[in-house]
């Protein structure tokens, strides 16, 4: 039996759900759904126009529906009123082949059929930049090779600690935090 998201929301005081999927460019797409509507969304899915989310579709295609996976529920540590859900995309009664999650599931199944196990994970990387996006956030970071620099790391300690604490609370089990600084133009070349 599937988990009842409405009951879970009431027990955990979740007011909204982010029903989410990833497009072909790796952008997370979502709809914010109030808890009162989650029962219907859990059954029928949240409607999206696939062409508007960079999936291989046109405006003439039917809407697709993101059916949330209750086992993926993460109550956001920085906003406990919100529960995040991964979803599977369906259109016209069939899985959407252009969905990265569907592609991954197919690959996992294919490998299992060959007696293999796929292991995957997330490397959480992010950039700390100024509010206007013009410079790195730490203007004291002037080293040519700043990776692993303790002074730089500790100047950003409060923010890095908050991010790491949230990952721990979500059950992601991070095992270290480090600081690596690089020019964004250099990163696009690598």
Briefly describe each language-model feature range.
Residues 180-190:
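Single conserved hydrophobic/aromatic residue that forms the stacking wall/gate
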Residues 1-176:
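ATP/Mg2+-dependent ligation/transfer catalytic cores
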